[in-house]
Design a protein with these regions (language model features):
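Cap/insert and terminal regions of metallo-dependent hydrolase folds
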Residues: 163-249
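Binuclear metal-dependent hydrolase catalytic cores
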Residues: 1-157, 164-170, 230-253
Length: 253
């Protein structure tokens, strides 16, 4: 399976990065719907798709409004959007409100109401059901992270959150093959990260170490304060199997 990081940035797009959206095309799994959502035009087809939203901040959901452009020249299968009740309410009632974007796409919204694991039938030939475990994160307005197990592979997706919240999800993400984790700030910005509901790149490495993750992919990169070479080398020394994601990165899982 291949993981495509379509957008690797946070907060707002820049000349280098669009905001978060990733896809595993083989299983129809989409992670968040930031400004990079338009890049799904290379993948969407008539099979079913599942979008998992972490929260309703615009850098994670604005791409949901791009549906009509993505479907103008192709037939697209049913799209199910998963998220907390609060996130889905914000998407339906605010993002798609009459003054902002009055034409709701034919998404099927399914609220996640507990942190218990559940399985999804992907309705794709040759695909086993996918196990999903939602985990609570610490971010203004609330957020969810996820662990996905499918086809003998495990992926954790954790953004946006603080280091203190890691105790709530470390057990769930133990020994994952790939940990996709935000790092909105370089080292030295720990106080700012805590205040805004984020982590630094050093803290993300600590989480990966504690979880026993095999690989760490850093996303939600700050569009204003990027990581310098010393910080990149420092994180690699702490956790060698790390990639600081760039847009359109492809990772074999």
């Amino acid at each position: 399976m291949q993981l495509h990081i379509l957008g690797s940035g946070g907060y707002h797009p820049s000349s280098k990065r669009h905001t978060l959206c990733s896809v595993i095309p083989e299983v129809g799994l989409i992670l968040d719907a930031g400004t990079a959502f338009f890049r799904l035009d290379r993948f969407l087809d008539e099979r079913p798709w599942n979008i998992f939203l972490t929260h309703a901040h615009l850098d994670h959901v604005i791409g949901l409004t791009y549906y009509w452009g993505l479907t103008q020249q192709r037939d697209v299968g049913p799209i199910t959007v998963w998220g907390s009740e609060n996130t889905l309410w914000a998407v339906k009632e605010l993002l798609f409100s009459e003054p902002l974007f009055p034409k709701m796409p034919p998404y099927h919204f399914v609220p996640i109401t507990s942190h218990e694991s559940f399985c999804i039938n992907l309705e794709r030939e040759g695909c086993d059901p996918m196990s999903v475990v939602p985990v609570p994160l610490s971010h203004p307005g609330g957020a969810l992270g996820y662990r996905f197990d499918i086809a003998g592979r495990s992926i954790a997706y954790i953004t946006d959150t603080t280091l203190e919240a890691a105790s709530a999800y470390l057990k769930v993400i133990q020994n994952v093959d790939v940990l996709i984790h935000e790092a909105f700030y370089p080292g030295g910005y720990e106080e700012m990260a805590q205040r805004t509901g984020h982590v630094t790149i050093r803290q993300a490495a600590q989480v990966a170490q504690s979880a026993g993750a095999k690989r760490l992919i850093i996303v939600h990169v700050n569009p204003v304060i990027d990581f310098n070479q010393d910080q990149r080398e420092g994180i690699a020394a702490t956790f060698p199997e790390v990639i600081i994601a760039s847009d359109n990165l492809v990772v074999e899982i």
